[in-house]
Each structure stands twice: as C-alpha cells, then as structure tokens.
C-alpha cells in the first residue's frame, strides 16, 4: 500500500495512521463489527476491502502481503481460512457503515462498520422476479402485436 498522501491524517503522522488502520482492520476481522468515528470508518472501508479481496485469492503471496498490512498471524489465518470463503460470491461491498448517535463526550459523529456476512439471497430473488416479469412483458407485447396484425389483415380484406 502506498504511503498516505497530503491532507488530514487520522491521529498524526503517516506511520501512526498505518498502525491505526492496521489495528482497526484486525479488530474488524476479529469481531465482525467495530464502533468508531465517521472519519475513521470512511478511511478504513477501502483499506479492509482491498485486504479481503486479496484474501479471496488465497495465494501465499497474498497472505504475505496481508501480513505486512496486518501483523497478527491469528487474525490473518482466520481471514484467509474462514472469512474469505464466505465472500467468495461477492464482488466487493464486504463492509457496511451504519451511522450512530454522536459521542456524548465530544459530540463526535459515530458509526459502526461491520462485515456483511449475509448471503445476497434477496438480490438474487429480486433478479429472478425481474427476469420473470420481463419475460411476461415480452410475451404480452408479442400477443398485442399479433392481435394488431390480425386486425390489420381483417380491415384490408374488408376493403
């Protein structure tokens, strides 16, 4: 991963930001969901998405690359062995961010970032119903076209 560019940092220098993201990613993988500020959640999302995509490939080189980013062997082993197969049919969108109430101490906007482990059954069911509806619409259009052609033939025969 490239070093962070110019702009605001989460908690100080680039090295501190790397460590912060590494620890947050490890906690997210270990617990499935973490509660953090909006800014940290928005920065963590692309970071963890890239890591999960590498874990889905599952090669030794990918495992070593992830170990450089998250130096927790047990967490990386859990990611590659148990979590990655759950995301096999998913092309991205492994996390979701849910807005929470502001923190009471400093009124900071809070969010919960969590892994999306549910199957996308609803979207597949929606696709199936849309496909069936489009087939029915095509059949209805074909029937209407046949009816109009039959009417046109009748009117030409009458003349």
Curated annotation (Swiss-Prot):
<dbReference type="GO" id="GO:0022625">
    <property type="term" value="C:cytosolic large ribosomal subunit"/>
</dbReference>
<dbReference type="Pfam" id="PF01196">
    <property type="entry name" value="Ribosomal_L17"/>
</dbReference>
<keyword id="KW-0689">Ribosomal protein</keyword>
<dbReference type="GO" id="GO:0003735">
    <property type="term" value="F:structural constituent of ribosome"/>
</dbReference>
<dbReference type="InterPro" id="IPR000456">
    <property type="entry name" value="Ribosomal_bL17"/>
</dbReference>
<feature type="compositionally biased region" description="Low complexity">
    <location>
        <begin position="124"/>
        <end position="135"/>
    </location>
</feature>
<dbReference type="InterPro" id="IPR036373">
    <property type="entry name" value="Ribosomal_bL17_sf"/>
</dbReference>
<dbReference type="GO" id="GO:0006412">
    <property type="term" value="P:translation"/>
</dbReference>
<keyword id="KW-0687">Ribonucleoprotein</keyword>
<feature type="region of interest" description="Disordered">
    <location>
        <begin position="124"/>
        <end position="159"/>
    </location>
</feature>
<feature type="compositionally biased region" description="Acidic residues">
    <location>
        <begin position="145"/>
        <end position="159"/>
    </location>
</feature>
<comment type="subunit">
    <text>Part of the 50S ribosomal subunit. Contacts protein L32.</text>
</comment>
<comment type="similarity">
    <text>Belongs to the bacterial ribosomal protein bL17 family.</text>
</comment>
<dbReference type="InterPro" id="IPR047859">
    <property type="entry name" value="Ribosomal_bL17_CS"/>
</dbReference>
<protein>
    <recommendedName>
        <fullName>Large ribosomal subunit protein bL17</fullName>
    </recommendedName>
</protein>
């Amino acid at each position: 991963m490239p070093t962070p560019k110019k702009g605001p940092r989460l908690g100080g220098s680039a090295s501190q930001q790397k460590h912060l993201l590494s620890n947050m990613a490890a906690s997210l993988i270990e617990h499935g969901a973490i509660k953090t500020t909006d800014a940290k959640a928005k920065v963590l999302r692309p970071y963890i998405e890239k890591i999960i995509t590498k874990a889905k490939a599952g090669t030794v080189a990918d495992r070593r690359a992830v170990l450089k980013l998250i130096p927790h062997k047990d967490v990386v082993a859990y990611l590659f062995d148990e979590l990655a197969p759950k995301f096999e049919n998913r092309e991205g969108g492994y996390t979701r961010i849910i807005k929470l109430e502001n923190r009471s101490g400093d009124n900071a906007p809070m969010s919960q970032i969590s892994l999306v482990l549910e199957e996308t059954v609803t979207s597949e069911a929606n696709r199936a119903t849309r496909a069936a509806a489009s087939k029915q619409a095509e059949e209805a259009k074909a029937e209407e076209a046949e009816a109009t052609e039959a009417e046109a033939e009748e009117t030409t025969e009458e003349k």
